[in-house]
């Protein structure tokens, strides 16, 4: 598809769908959005109000949010969409039927991007009768309007034109897309999170560290560096910089890391009732007094400040800005 994308259909407006709506509206796009859940439309309006300060950073709030329609029959409106962002439940049979419906009613060539967080699109295109080559994964991180990352994951039959359309579109709305060259369950970032979380659960449930100190070990340590340069560049910097620095780091720390890996695998979190109970007990102590509304508000504020600071640095800015 070569035409400009001006209208996006959002199918499913849970937290992810609502975040996409805020992002697309902030960029002046028209949004047609639908969700069968009772109360979904009111929830969407409330989410827009919560995101008022973000939207006001891009223009007049009332003007921006007037550019969407909540509809109950999305199929009858799909022909108007230049791109479709699907956010249905992570249930395979449901996803297959939904994607087939989107494929049936979408205009030829219109990309159908799924926000699936772990199911590869090759698993839910079987019922597509029109054109499965335009289906791919466009997986965001929550909240989509704040965190730039989106993982673009084509299935083996996805056309290169559809991939390029998705990549260019996400860049145009301020996202930082990454392209996966092969499908893997969970994609990239969720696999990284799973590896870190599983080790975190193991350390906490074994009584080695509290949940509170585990979070501090990330937020006051490597998490700060990873947010700026990522694990690979951080390793290279630790070895003096450049590809040679990465190689030196691997040679110097490789034997020790392999030893840690043996211990990590030996004590990996087994999801047993005993381990789960110990983990939950520490989490209760750590998080019981947290004021969650305040935490979310402050998190989003600092996140925006961090993104703005990174954007000013040539080596850390996103290609299209955010």
UniProtKB/Swiss-Prot annotation:
<dbReference type="GO" id="GO:0050104">
    <property type="term" value="F:L-gulonate 3-dehydrogenase activity"/>
</dbReference>
<dbReference type="Pfam" id="PF00725">
    <property type="entry name" value="3HCDH"/>
</dbReference>
<keyword id="KW-0812">Transmembrane</keyword>
<keyword id="KW-0560">Oxidoreductase</keyword>
<dbReference type="GO" id="GO:0016020">
    <property type="term" value="C:membrane"/>
</dbReference>
<dbReference type="InterPro" id="IPR006176">
    <property type="entry name" value="3-OHacyl-CoA_DH_NAD-bd"/>
</dbReference>
<dbReference type="GO" id="GO:0070403">
    <property type="term" value="F:NAD+ binding"/>
</dbReference>
<dbReference type="GO" id="GO:0006631">
    <property type="term" value="P:fatty acid metabolic process"/>
</dbReference>
<dbReference type="InterPro" id="IPR036291">
    <property type="entry name" value="NAD(P)-bd_dom_sf"/>
</dbReference>
<protein>
    <recommendedName>
        <fullName>3-hydroxyacyl-CoA dehydrogenase FVEG_12628</fullName>
        <ecNumber>1.1.1.-</ecNumber>
    </recommendedName>
</protein>
<dbReference type="InterPro" id="IPR013328">
    <property type="entry name" value="6PGD_dom2"/>
</dbReference>
<comment type="function">
    <text>3-hydroxyacyl-CoA dehydrogenase; part of the Fusarium detoxification of benzoxazolinone cluster 2 (FDB2) involved in the degradation of benzoxazolinones produced by the host plant. Maize, wheat, and rye produce the 2 benzoxazinone phytoanticipins 2,4-dihy-droxy-7-methoxy-1,4-benzoxazin-3-one (DIMBOA) and 2,4-dihydroxy-1,4-benzoxazin-3-one (DIBOA) that, due to their inherent instability once released, spontaneously degrade to the more stable corresponding benzoxazolinones, 6-methoxy-2-benzoxazolinone (MBOA) and 2-benzoxazolinone (BOA), respectively.</text>
</comment>
<dbReference type="InterPro" id="IPR008927">
    <property type="entry name" value="6-PGluconate_DH-like_C_sf"/>
</dbReference>
<comment type="similarity">
    <text>Belongs to the 3-hydroxyacyl-CoA dehydrogenase family.</text>
</comment>
<keyword id="KW-0472">Membrane</keyword>
<keyword id="KW-1133">Transmembrane helix</keyword>
<dbReference type="InterPro" id="IPR006108">
    <property type="entry name" value="3HC_DH_C"/>
</dbReference>
<feature type="active site" description="For hydroxyacyl-coenzyme A dehydrogenase activity">
    <location>
        <position position="151"/>
    </location>
</feature>
<feature type="site" description="Important for hydroxyacyl-coenzyme A dehydrogenase activity">
    <location>
        <position position="139"/>
    </location>
</feature>
<feature type="transmembrane region" description="Helical">
    <location>
        <begin position="5"/>
        <end position="25"/>
    </location>
</feature>
<dbReference type="Pfam" id="PF02737">
    <property type="entry name" value="3HCDH_N"/>
</dbReference>
């Amino acid at each position: 598809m070569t035409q400009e994308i001006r209208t996006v259909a959002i199918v499913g407006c849970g937290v992810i769908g609502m975040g996409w709506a805020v992002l697309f509206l902030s960029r002046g796009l028209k949004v047609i959005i639908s969700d069968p859940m009772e109360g979904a439309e009111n929830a969407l309006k409330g989410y827009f109000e919560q995101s008022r300060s973000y939207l006001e950073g891009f223009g007049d709030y009332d003007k921006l949010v007037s550019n969407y329609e909540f509809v109950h029959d999305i199929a009858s409106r799909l022909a108007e969409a230049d791109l479709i962002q699907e956010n249905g439940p992570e249930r395979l049979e449901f996803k297959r039927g939904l994607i087939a419906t989107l494929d049936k009613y979408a205009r030829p060539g219109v990309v159908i991007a799924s926000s699936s967080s772990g199911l590869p699109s090759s698993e839910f295109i079987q019922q597509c009768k029109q054109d499965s080559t335009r289906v791919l994964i466009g997986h965001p991180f929550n909240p989509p309007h704040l965190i730039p990352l989106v993982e673009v994951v084509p299935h083996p039959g996805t056309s290169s034109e559809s991939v390029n359309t998705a990549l260019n579109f996400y860049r145009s709305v301020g996202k930082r897309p990454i392209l996966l060259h092969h499908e893997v369950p969970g994609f990239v970032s969720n696999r990284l999170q799973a590896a870190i979380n599983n080790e975190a659960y193991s350390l906490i449930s074994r009584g080695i560290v509290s949940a509170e100190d585990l979070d501090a070990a990330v937020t006051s340590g490597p998490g700060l560096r990873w947010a700026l340069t990522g694990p690979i560049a951080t390793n290279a910097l630790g070895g003096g910089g450049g590809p040679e620095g990465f190689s030196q780091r691997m040679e110097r720390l490789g034997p020790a890391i392999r030893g840690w890996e043996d211990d990590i695998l030996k004590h990996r979190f087994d999801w047993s009732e005993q381990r789960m109970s110990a983990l939950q007990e520490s989490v209760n102590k750590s998080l019981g007094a947290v004021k969650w509304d305040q935490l979310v508000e402050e998190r989003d504020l600092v996140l925006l400040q961090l993104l703005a600071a990174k954007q000013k640095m040539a080596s850390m800015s996103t290609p299209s800005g955010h």
